[in-house]
Amino acid sequence: MAFRKFFDSIEPDFKAGGKYEKLYPIYEMVETIFYTSSTVTKAAPHARSFVDMKRIMTYVVISTIPCILWAFYNTGLQTNIYLSEINSSELNGWRIWLLQLFGIPFNPNSIFANMAHGALYFFPIYITTLVAGGVCEVFFATKRGHEVNEGFLVSSMLYTLTLPATTPLWMVALGIIFGVIVGKEVFGGTGKNFLNPALTGRAFLYFAYPAYMSGDSVWVPVDGVTSATSLSISAAEGYQSLISYGITWSDAFLGTIQGSLGETSTLACLIGLAFLLVTRIANYRLIIGCLAGMIVFSSFLN
């Protein structure tokens, strides 16, 4: 109730004619975090549902949680596998300092140690994405006088999950800014764009800075360590050669392999998919159609 009174008291300053009217999109963004928007349709058809855009986007963000948790674990696992073989006195960096400060070992057999270490790579990238992309979103919202769309929460999460853990933070910011502006805002904003902002930003980084987005040295954040992904091995030598590299089908399915932060685990992706199907946010027909199209055209091109 106190929150409601607070928002009601400052709302006139952000409405048309108020001293902060240009900042209304920011006010609306914060208010709708706590309360349902009062905006309703004025012309038919009227869809009577509690599921609005904010709730849909919230469900999509929830569906990424399995991939996020696996990003923590697998990034820490791949890093600790190599760090456990190095003398701790030779290690440096703020992540190493924090882990040693709290007595967290570089033990690849410890779930907690892997999760903690992986989180120290995930959160800087995600926070950078939120800040850089969020500033772009707010800028265009205030300039055009429309609300800040919740879809950016989804874009920021998906973009983060597609990046290697070794991506420099300045590059993270550059990619998401490009994705938001070129992938969405130049077309008029959410609902008018035909490009996915997250994938647009990722594609930009891939072509602009290929050495940071591909190869054998970008997947494990340990200096001097090179390790190819299962896809690159399969492309170069055939999938039968994966066994010789110590990669089994169960490893590939669970995701205990090298790769981008949130893209290694098929199981985590399927759990997120199941959530979207159960909540009816995703339509199984679209998913089957996309898979069928990908398989057919990939077969032709190969």
Describe every region a protein language model picked out.
Residues 1-122, 126:
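N-terminal signal-anchor module of multipass membrane proteins
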